Amino acid sequence: YRTVALIQTGGAMIDASLRVLRTDVAGMPIEWIGFEEAVRLHCLDQILYPMGSVLYHVHGGINARSGEQSTLAIHSIICTAGQSRAYLKRLPSYAPPLNNSTLFRRDANLCLYCGDQFRNTDLSRDHVEPLSKGGRDVWQNVVTACKRCNHHKGSRTPEEAGMQLLAVPFVPTHAEYIYLSGRRILADQMEFLLAHFPRNSLLHSRLNAGDGNSHPQRR
């Protein structure tokens, strides 16, 4: 079961787990933010324009003259002021931060040795070229592996261990990383992110096939 945090705003309860997709001035996805941060950006006049559906209606104070209560609509996607990060798409050396949760999601929670699907808690990060042999802890040298396969492989290469790698590890683009780090992505947010994926994106192909958001199976 998933625990949903509910916050009372203006007398109504809202699901605080829904995230807002923030973009830069050029429309490039930057990060996921909560509704509190979205309200703060509104107050600082940092939102250029909203996109997508309305997630929340946040109620403010009551105007002493008109007696009307202010209401702020928080959209699923917001374009914000500031420096454009579009240059990230043109940097061949750009690599997003590496962490296990996004790595496992990149590989669809599949062990890339045995091919079975697992929960995050039953998975591990495997270095194709072991660190002890000079391998690096980078996207293109790490794959998702179940703990049994990782233990069997040990500090050997797949060839030395007689194990076949089922897919070639790749470095996600910035937009792909935003997708990988997201949770409960809404349809309009997903459509927006897909438009920023490369044409040859492996993630794009997987999502079109309908298994990009598959959940780990219980084992």
Model-identified regions with their sequence ranges:
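Short, conserved, surface-exposed binding loops centered on an aromatic residue
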Residues: 102-106, 115-117
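Short cysteine-rich clusters marking metal-coordination/redox-active sites
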Residues: 111-114, 146
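Histidine-centered nuclease catalytic patch
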Residues: 96, 116-144, 153-169
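A generic structural motif
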Residues: 26, 136, 149-151
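Short metal-coordination and nucleic-acid-contact micro-motifs, chiefly zinc-binding Cys/His arrays
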Residues: 104-109, 138-142
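Short helix-coil boundary/hinge micro-motifs
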Residues: 4-95, 100, 163-219
